[in-house]
């Protein structure tokens, strides 16, 4: 990932650090429609996720998370930017004429070949079942349910590790630190997701964040009492509570938000680290 640092010619470019290496390609049958986000509203138009709205118009890129082109070699033709995710994407041309997008594995370059299936080589970008992988393999785009496609470790720089196989299950250590069981028949892709240095980017100005559809975040302590439990007071007043609270009065820090008695509790051997 190439980070471009701007000269401090204006206040807006003083702290900017962006990636100028990867471009976007809109001339493709896999790119279609306008991706209309909900802007944080539900079906009734009520805000359910704050600090979202606006943003530049986006086209949706259809990503192949299933990797069901079995035993057919594909070649990486382009590495492109995707406005709908932090990770980059690769355009793959398969030997049978099929064209698909996949998540860009870290270190993959244009011209590399990939393949998916059982007992394929343990090579970066190849997709195969967990039962055919040796212990200690770094993987991403991991299936939870067989045939449903990858759902875990898909963000930029994400990587999981295969640490054990026993019976019908495999034990994985996820990027969050969680250790859980998954069926050995589920597939995953070898390697780490690319664009691992995304956290080194600095937008430099508020307008760049608005392009991404992110609105300003206002602290509760500067609001009025009617708007937030932390609001009110004369001048810079403390929150007036023993513990911080959400705008709706629930405990803000340290409270577990996971649903109790969830079906997957038996599959989680160690909770994620915070």
UniProtKB/Swiss-Prot annotation:
Residues 1-20, 224-274 are annotated as: Disordered. InterPro entries: NA-bd_OB-fold (IPR012340), Rib_uL2_dom2 (IPR014722), Ribosomal_uL2 (IPR002171), Ribosomal_uL2_bac/org-type (IPR005880), Ribosomal_uL2_C (IPR022669), Ribosomal_uL2_CS (IPR022671), Ribosomal_uL2_dom3 (IPR014726), Ribosomal_uL2_RNA-bd_dom (IPR022666). One of its GO terms (biological process) is mitochondrial translation. It is found in: Plastid, Chloroplast. One of its GO terms (cellular component) is chloroplast. Keywords: Chloroplast, Plastid, Ribonucleoprotein, Ribosomal protein. GO terms for molecular function: rRNA binding; structural constituent of ribosome; transferase activity. It comes from the Eukaryota. Belongs to the universal ribosomal protein uL2 family. Part of the 50S ribosomal subunit. This is Large ribosomal subunit protein uL2cy. It comes from Populus alba.
């Amino acid at each position: 990932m190439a980070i471009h640092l701007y000269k401090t010619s204006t206040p807006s470019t003083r702290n900017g650090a962006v990636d100028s290496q990867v471009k976007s390609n809109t001339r493709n049958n896999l790119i279609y429609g306008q991706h209309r986000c909900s802007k944080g509203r539900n079906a009734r138009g009520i805000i359910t996720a704050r600090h979202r709205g606006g943003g530049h118009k986006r086209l949706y890129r259809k990503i192949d998370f299933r990797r069901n082109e079995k035993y057919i070699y594909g070649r990486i033709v382009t590495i492109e930017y995707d406005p709908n995710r932090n990770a980059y994407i690769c355009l793959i041309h398969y030997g049978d004429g099929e064209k698909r997008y996949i998540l860009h594995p870290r270190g993959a370059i244009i011209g590399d070949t990939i393949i998916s299936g059982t007992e394929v080589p343990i090579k970066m970008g190849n997709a195969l079942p967990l039962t055919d992988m040796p212990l200690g393999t770094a993987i991403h785009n991991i299936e939870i349910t067989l045939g449903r496609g990858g759902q875990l470790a898909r963000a930029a720089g994400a990587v999981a590790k295969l640490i054990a196989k026993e019976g019908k299950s495999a034990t994985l250590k996820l990027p969050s630190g969680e250790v859980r069981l998954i069926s050995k028949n589920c597939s995953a892709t070898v390697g780490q997701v690319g664009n691992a240095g995304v956290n080194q980017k600095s937008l430099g100005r508020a307008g760049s964040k608005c392009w991404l559809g992110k609105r300003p975040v206002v602290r509760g302590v500067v609001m009025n009492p009617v708007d937030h439990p932390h609001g009110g007071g004369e001048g810079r007043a403390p929150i007036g509570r023993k513990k911080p609270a959400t705008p709706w009065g629930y405990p803000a820090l340290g409270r577990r938000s996971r649903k109790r008695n969830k079906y997957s509790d038996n599959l989680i051997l160690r909770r994620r680290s915070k």
